[in-house]
Amino acid sequence: VIIIGGGICGCALAYFLALDGVEVTLLERSGLNSASSGANSGSLHGQIPHETFLDKGEEWAHTFGPTLSLMHESIQLWKKIEESLETDLEIRLTGGLLVAKNDKEIKAIRAKAAIEKKFGIHSEHLDKSQLRKFAPYLSEDTIGAMYYPEEGKANPLLVTPAFALKAEILGVQITRQAEVKGILVKRKGFRVDTTKGSFTCNRVVNCAGIDVGSINAMVGLANKVFAEPIQSNVTEPMEQLVDHLIYSAGERLTLKQTLHGSFIIGGGWPCLINKITGRLLICFDSFIRNLTVATGVVPSLESAQLVRTWPAWVNATDDWIPILGEADSIRGFFVCAFPYLGFTGGPISARILADMILS
């Protein structure tokens, strides 16, 4: 098996296959964990994304619903990953809070929770008095929240390298700086041509993240995946205050505190693209609005010093639905694309693909 892409899904898949004795080569065009898998903010999600629910509506939410089962199964794998990989990945599953500040927002979070319940995701509504005891760090104008216990965080700088290290110990050949230039579909198997030479195999798995589409095009497959530019922020370390993964029902927000005390603030706010170089640039408007939402939800953040804001690409689709499995028209060619929530869904995506290949 040749795996294209050294992010969380590619490295986890290499590890799972190697555990079962499969001969695996992983090709990475740059460095491992150098794109979305390492540049995301480390949230482990279990809910329908609220901002998207508001944008796309209840019909879309029902279509997205089955993806919640994948996310739930992935969270179950996350609970075991540190033991399997024998290392601390700073995984904490203390639950997520979607907070509301007015009756309109309360109505919306209840409507979303009702749909999630149909797919086995059971959130608990907390009123203002309950929140004061449960999460006293929230602003006083917060009037309620939905709490889902199966959410949390992990350190994205540690997870993918840990999978890769174990995979290499098990015999996986990882070739870095190997950009794929073409794929030849042979009568039996494939030839993958790269800047580090050509490789032959029986099966190819496309785990190339934002480049899934360009790899698919090499074998004539249609593409639904595109790259979306977003940015995140991190503060200086502060005294431990926030236990949960925090969302806002008002505007985009994900907020969590790392084990080292820093706050990571995101939510999918867009960044800019230099039209000449193609490089990503910080969007000042997104920066201000994101931090305004964050301090409005957790007022103690107003005294925090910001350390860094960074832009990154995330792989996306219009419908947010994962693409996992073997191409109908090309036997032995598999695709893995888990849009927007790929850090959460990486382990289960890899496990599913490994089971498909092994069967």
What do the PLM-derived regions correspond to, one by one?
Residues 12, 19, 57-65, 183-285, ...:
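Flavin-dependent oxidoreductases
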Residues 145-202:
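Helical element adjacent to the flavin cofactor pocket in flavoenzyme catalytic cores
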Residues 18-40:
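Glycine-rich FAD pyrophosphate-binding loop
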Residues 87-100, 112-113, 119, 123-170, ...:
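Helix-loop-beta segment of a Rossmann-like dinucleotide-binding subdomain
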Residues 43-130, 252:
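Dinucleotide-binding Rossmann-like beta1-alpha1 core, especially the glycine-rich loop
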Residues 1-26:
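N-terminal Rossmann-like FAD-binding beta1-loop-alpha1 element of flavoenzymes
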Residues 123, 292-359:
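C-terminal catalytic lobe of FAD-dependent flavoproteins
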